A protein has these predicted regions:
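Phosphate/diphosphate ligand-binding glycine-rich loop within oxidoreductases
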Residues: 29-104
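Alpha-helix C-terminal capping/helix-to-coil transition sites in glycosyltransferase folds
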Residues: 26-27, 48, 170-171, 196-199, ...
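Phosphate-binding beta-alpha-beta segment of Rossmann-like dinucleotide-binding domains, i.e.
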Residues: 70-72, 77-123, 127, 135-138, ...
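Rossmann-like dinucleotide-binding domain for NAD(H)/NADP(H)
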Residues: 74, 200-289
Length: 289
């Protein structure tokens, strides 16, 4: 930014107080943010704001509609975390299938572990076939999985069979969520659909927490109705309250929203975020949402 002749002020923490957030950004022409919520009431107070560069793929935490009404350009860091997130999907799956957490505990207890499970030959269901969903499908095929998908926009790709969401939930051994969070996907994986899952199926969510009914998921795990879950995203950002329902659910691998966080992805994110600003300044904005 300095090399481009821009003056900037950096903050090293999220601001949860709306008035304090407004104080930070009210005089800015451009705001760069990652997972800092940026609601309409803040946008309304930013009379000089012309552009927001979101250093994230999802923009559900930004009042995009209010920005559009005010002619504020919003760009995201599309594609920066595709490899990072899709690779974590398989880290979660293998942790569940090969009981990696349990293995560490058994190093000193001497308790015999139950056999693990292989990915090869499993029916792998993908909800949402955007960039991350398709990359996940590609990796799943290399493991020898049969890949099924549900998406509002179907793509003609060899090795992916599109089916209904209900059929996917009912028949797949592994279900991985990759849709963005919006009004139509909130609680998409509902209690009713979780009840449709096979007893030996596992559910993976590296997309957004509110897409899944997490209370229903926790109950299904505690009741033994499904085999496990690997979750990197929650209804609220970690740290979670001690009574959050998934924290004491069995057969889970929980991560504190780090799917995007690899050295390679964070470098790519920084490059895209700055390029979004320079492209906008030159009159040719990119990655506009």
């Amino acid at each position: 930014l300095e090399n481009n002749g821009d003056e900037y002020i950096a903050y090293d923490s999220r601001e949860t107080d709306t008035d304090k957030l407004i104080e930070r950004v009210k005089d800015a022409d451009v705001v760069v943010l990652a997972n800092q919520p940026f609601p309409a009431e803040v946008v309304e107070k930013c009379e000089k704001l012309k552009m927001i560069s979101v250093a994230f793929t999802g923009v559900d935490h930004v009042a995009v509609d209010e920005c559009k009404k005010r002619g504020i350009c919003v760009c995201n860091a599309a594609g920066y975390s595709t490899n990072a997130v899709s690779e974590l999907v398989f880290g979660l799956i293998i942790s569940l299938y090969r009981k990696i957490n349990e293995g560490k505990e058994n190093m000193t207890s001497g308790v015999k572990m139950a056999p693990g499970i292989e990915l090869s030959g499993k029916k792998f269901g993908i909800i949402g076939t955007g960039a991350i969903g398709l990359k996940t499908a590609e990796i799943a095929k290399t493991f020898g999985c049969e890949v099924y998908a549900y998406s509002r926009t179907e793509k003609h790709i060899d090795g992916i069979k599109y089916i209904t969401l209900c059929d996917l939930m009912r028949t797949c051994d592994i279900i991985s969520v990759h849709v963005p969070l919006n009004d139509s996907t909130k609680d998409l994986v509902s209690s009713m659909l979780i009840d449709e899952m096979k007893s030996d199926a596992i559910l993976i969510n590296t997309a957004r927490g509110p897409i899944i009914d997490n209370a229903a998921l926790a109950k299904a795990l505690k009741d033994g109705k499904i085999a496990g879950a690997g979750i990197d995203v929650f209804d609220t950002e970690p740290p979670l309250a001690p009574d959050y329902p998934l924290l004491d659910a069995p057969n889970t691998v929980l991560m504190p929203h780090i799917g995007f966080s690899t050295k390679e992805a964070l470098y790519k994110r920084a490059v895209i975020t700055i390029n979004n600003i320079t492209s906008w300044k030159s009159g040719e904005p990119q990655n506009v949402v």
